[in-house]
Amino acid sequence: MGIADFLAQKKTAQAKANLEAGQTFLANNAQKEGVVSLPSGLQYEVIHMGDGPKPTLHHKVTCHYHGTLIDGTVFDSSVQRQQPASFPLSAVIKGWTEALQLMPIGSKWRLFIPPQLGYGDRQVGSHIGPNSTLVFEVELISFT
């Protein structure tokens, strides 16, 4: 077995382990009070509900966010950088696209994103492994 085969086997094993851990996490999380589960598999918890308008797919949104894995490992945080992020809503992972269209401006929600609405079976950076379930706290500041 060559190095490429070894790395492929390692990625497959990690993807399987991440998928199983995420499925268990989401099943348990769905039972928690205040957690809403959508047909897509997306789950969310409202930390604060804003009262402004909601963005659509064609808007550019400005948000603060803090992203972790289910074990609490932080992989990205505009909060830690002290700089909100702006991006087209159509250019982010499916879980964000779905959730943010439900959020009024001024809202802060915790999102629980299964792999099929996140990065799927791709390795992203050094922290997000294949089939990772992602957790984000997202505050919708504005949109244009």
Feature-to-residue mapping (PLM):
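Cross-family detector of peptidyl-prolyl cis-trans isomerase
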Residues: M1-T144
